[in-house]
């Protein structure tokens, strides 16, 4: 869990509609593969960046854990 100031930061940087590319996801069950792009659908109060991926999946990114960048 990240602190409230970091959640505010993540919400200020990643806005609904922003495009994201995934470089590394730490999900042992169903990670998003390297280079997959998607669109941010929102950031929740825990700082999870929710993404609708171009491959049809919806899965959140964890700031500071998963590797990703704006396109």
Where are these regions (language model features)?
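Basic/aromatic-rich interaction segments and small domains that mediate binding to polyanionic partners
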Residues: 2-11, 15-71
């Amino acid at each position: 869990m990240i602190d409230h100031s970091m959640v505010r930061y993540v919400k200020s940087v990643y806005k609904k509609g922003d495009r994201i590319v995934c470089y590394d996801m730490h999900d042992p069950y169903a990670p998003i593969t390297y280079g997959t792009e998607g669109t941010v659908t929102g950031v929740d109060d825990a700082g999870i960046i929710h993404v609708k991926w171009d491959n049809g999946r919806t899965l959140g990114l964890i700031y500071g854990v998963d590797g990703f960048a704006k396109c």
